[in-house]
Design a protein with these regions (language model features):
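Short, hydrophobic beta-strand segments that form beta-sheet elements in well-ordered domains
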Residues: 137-143
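Active-site ExK catalytic segment of metal-dependent nucleases
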Residues: 104-116
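Arginine/glycine-rich "motif VI" loop of SF2 helicases in the C-terminal RecA-like domain
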Residues: 76-79, 128-136
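Domain-level recognition of nuclease-like catalytic cores that cleave nucleotide substrates
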Residues: 144-171
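Active-site-adjacent loop/helix micro-motif of nuclease/hydrolase catalytic cores
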Residues: 115-125
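Conserved beta-strand segments of alpha/beta enzyme cores
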Residues: 40, 83, 138, 156-158
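Accessory nucleic acid-recognition modules appended to NTPase machines
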Residues: 1-104
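Short glycine-/acidic-enriched loop or helix-start segments at secondary-structure transitions
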Residues: 53, 119, 150-152
Length: 171
């Protein structure tokens, strides 16, 4: 894309991670090669992204919220021998998956705003499909300001505003 080889880009990304400017979240898979190959990038400090043209666009606010959640998950689970992943198939994606010893403990979706029915259904359906696939009952949807409990398909989804989720003590 920019005339830089994959090898060079991987090296640069590695340097940025070593400098604690970026963190990588790997794709959840039982195959090590797939985990190593697919990594999502998050900035450690969202203030580093203020030079982006779309700083205050709704899309960027969602990206920033997802970054904040990622950093908090890494902080919460750093000493608990848990790993943070994302999961993606052709038809759905889970933003964050918390696993201990290969067993999925929690599925988390992040969406700045779920007032649009389409967005709301996309996030809920991803959690429900993930719950079924990984036999996980701990389902959370983090938003900017919405709080409610959703009961659907014999599952309970806790919808929490980011402020409340960030301030809660972890079990």
């Amino acid at each position: 894309m920019f005339g830089v080889s994959n090898h060079t880009a991987e090296n640069y990304f590695g340097y940025l991670k070593e400098a604690f400017l970026f963190v990588g979240v790997r794709k959840f898979s039982y195959k090590a090669s797939e985990r190593l190959r697919n990594e999502k990038c998050y900035v450690v400090d969202v203030a580093l992204s203020t030079e982006r043209i779309d700083t205050f666009s709704l899309e960027n606010l969602g990206w920033r919220l997802e970054n904040v959640v990622c950093i908090e998950l890494l902080r919460r689970y750093h000493h608990q021998y848990a790993e943070i992943f994302y999961y993606k198939e052709k038809s759905f994606e889970i933003d964050f998956l918390v696993a201990k010893n290969g067993i999925v403990q929690e599925l988390i979706q992040v969406s700045y705003n779920v007032t649009s029915e389409r967005t709301r259904q996309r996030e809920i359906n991803a959690l429900l499909r993930g719950a079924k696939k990984f036999n996980c009952r701990n389902l959370t949807l983090i938003t900017f300001s919405t709080e409610q409990t959703i009961e659907k398909d014999n599952e309970t989804i806790n919808v929490l505003p980011a402020t409340k989720w960030l301030l809660e003590s972890k079990r």
